[in-house]
Amino acid sequence: MLNFVYRNRVKLGLPTFFAGMGSLVGGVIVAHYAGFPVGEIVDYFNWIPRGWLPQTIGQFVAFSGSQLILIGLVLMAWSDKPLTWSKAAYFSFLSWLQLTLIFGVLPSEWLNLAQGPLEWTNQREFIKFPPMLFLGNEVSMSFGALKDIIQLGISQGALIAVFVLGYLVQ
């Protein structure tokens, strides 16, 4: 599989790049216009459904498009020749973009979704544990704590994936 991808890297890289551009543009348009209030009439894109779910789907499509763009850019520059300084700088820039998206944008958008439309705050109770588990004390977990646990899982999972990928690349 890897040999096939390497042999056809330009044939695969360019369409992947343009598919990513289309997904990014389409996702941003849907995410932007889905965020408007229900009764507000907007230009040409009034047909886009409103609410947090279409907005989140648009953000997911845009994020997926950004990943396709980066994959396409890597495939187009991938070669079996010795690595030059300029190509190393190019790959390090793409790596920096990827890490910025994963560790900056993705957790931020998750927190915006959880704190905004979903209203996962510390005042809302997610689960109340049985008192017999905690020596008769009442212990509960709020949606705010659940939101932070999910964000921590996203960041830590990505960090572990970066470590494993860095080990495998060497």
Task: Describe each model-derived feature in a short phrase.
Residues 1-68, 73:
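Transmembrane alpha-helical insertion/packing segments
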Residues 9-17, 59, 86-92, 151-155:
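Transmembrane alpha-helices of multi-pass eukaryotic membrane proteins
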Residues 18-28, 90-118:
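Hydrophobic alpha-helical membrane-insertion segments
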Residues 28, 32, 71, 75, ...:
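Short hydrophobic alpha-helical membrane-anchoring segments
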Residues 36-50, 110-143:
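Membrane-interfacial helical/loop segments at transmembrane boundaries in membrane proteins
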Residues 54-63, 128-162:
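Hydrophobic alpha-helical transmembrane segments
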Residues 65-81, 145-170:
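Transmembrane alpha-helical segments in integral membrane proteins
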Residues 69-103:
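Cytoplasmic juxtamembrane interface segments
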